[in-house]
Amino acid sequence: MPTEALRPFFLFILLFCLITPLPAVANEVEETESSLDVMGKVLDHDYVEIAGKKIYLPRIFYVDGNFYFYSNTQSALESGEFVESEIGGIVRADGKPITIDFSISAHLIFFWLGVFLTFLITWLAARRYRRGVGSETEPRGVLQNLFEVFFVFVRDDIAKEYIPGEKYHKYVNYLFSVFLAISFMNLFGLFPWGITPTANLTVTATLAGITFLITQVSGTRDHWEHVFMFPGVHPLVRIILTPVEIIGLFTKPFALAIRLFANMLSGKIMIVSILGLIFVFTDMFGAWLGVGSSVFWVLLTALLYVLKGFIALLQAYIFTLLSAVFIGMAAEEHHHEDHESSVTTTAEATAKT
């Protein structure tokens, strides 16, 4: 895909990241002023905040074979069945933990929103292509052109590059969907009162788990032979290598989940921490220095928002790239003499990230 085709989009992202921080930073300052609890700003909540107003979400508990439904946390506490824990959260009135908590949280809401937008955009694009717009004629409109740019990018530069032969056709739809969904989820945090669901390990672990399942289902006979048998390797050496390969099957999705989670969480923590320095300086040196230094901290935070916008897309690309690499390794019909070449290709792809 020619780089020139992506330039208008990157220009749009740059302008978007320059404008968006203004209300977003103001919102962060307002939230940080009431509390300097950094982790409290990045953890999941039982509410979503829109225009400064909190909308509390339903609580659903499964306890001893029964489901309990409440409109919000306050209703659950008022029922007498549950009480607030000393370390946070809700437990049963007898002090025992809840068996399964199916409650809807803020991260889950924005996760669903990212999935919904991905489905909506792909459905609208598919409908236009069925009508011949883009297939028989040139794509029309900014959205369809952007859709085609990213789809061709994922297909040609990721799927076709790292999944052997014609097998990439089976996986390009998944890779494009996960790229689009993660991009949306990462970018949500740039909006005022927005939340980044990929800063939740449960979300990233779920996405990595899907890649893990697809990878194992795609595994060829050659792939599993190299996991358990190692053709051409001395039997005593297999005793060492086989456990390492089995562990490697699980460390790959683990690395996918942790990489995305850590990068998105650290960005939010850094922004809240820098804004918190305004109030630290105010408490330590007086209001005059706190207010005077606030200009610098707010400008620095605005620049971090710009960087965070690019990182949001970069992390979506890395997750998609590594997913394609892992699927390609499992789907490859290789022989023992080609194993070293396969490992080298994987190392090169990982080095790009």
Question: Which residues make up each language-model segment?
Answer:
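Bacterial N-terminal signal peptides that target proteins for export
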Residues: 1-10
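Selective transmembrane helix interface/packing segments
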Residues: 2, 25-353
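Hydrophobic alpha-helical transmembrane segments of integral membrane proteins
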Residues: 5, 17-18, 249
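Bacterial N-terminal signal peptides
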Residues: 9-21
